[in-house]
């Protein structure tokens, strides 16, 4: 955990807290988190929560990575963990993790226009990114990490030449399909992030095997020393934190495989990684430089969205939302932002087929790599788009994270109405409409005579009332 504040538009780190939970070590072959590891992680969230619970919403970002992506039973634990922490916890995709890692690392590197490789070893995944300056160009997240690799090949702590070779081969097999993308021919500088790589540098430096960073010669000597020791211990490796004993051999095998496959001669080490990337991403959101907005606009361009039509829907949304009361858990600005994004992207599915285009659009949004969006974010956006027309799938909102699981249904109805009112592209302006709304009642009041002049809108609203009725929502208008 990193605690920081903004001074003169610069991030100043105030405190760093770290606890070794090794969540991946508690993942069973059936992809369930054991009760013991759940409790250990929950206890950690309680301790972190003491520091963070008093901070205002929007000032904290907490993310879960590979293990929470893989675990089948992460949902109930996540709910308890968010309560303990006092803030939402987002599960992010591997590609999004890679983007954030690069963002964190690149802040400490010069803007020299040179291509660099960034590598980060986590507990259950390893990320590789090639980028220039602040821009990532190629990103991959491979399902191998220091914890998972150590459990698979060094579970009892014993290290031998045969075991280590098998671990290196296993890592090479994961890396093989992407070897050509990240080979040393593709970049000028290799940079490592994460505790495993920093620990490796520390071991090499203390032994005089590498003056700075990780050299291939020093790495080979360290691998031999680890194998000769037979198992990690304090007497042979006094610089190594005992908490890292269980996970370090697997991480070292991943480093060895990477150096061999990509023909790396030397790698420098960065202090920045995922947490620093999250800080800079959060700063961007605060300063209205939200990468999610760029992602939405890129999607809109890719799927040929009619920008003028989307803006008209957003204007009507704005008028309707201004008449609603909002709570502390979901403020007007946040609700408006999400509904604006959904309005922009609501018909991207037409690029696949007109029939069922709301379902096609939802599939794209749920499964595409969307920079800046967590898994829960993508599910929310997909649900809003899926529910914008035809039968109202109220049950989908139960799977959303708070507060959208409770309030999302009503706001989705507002989105439906705004889109419905602009169903005719010829109708560029909607008159002032009075909206009354609660969980089960929606009442629209139009200016006198307007509905009589727009019989198609009346027919659309009558049909909409039929769609909403099974969800126990009564729509009336006049």
What are these regions (language model features)?
Residues 16-19:
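Short amphipathic
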Residues 115-125, 129:
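A generic, well-ordered mixed alpha/beta core segment in the N-terminal half of proteins
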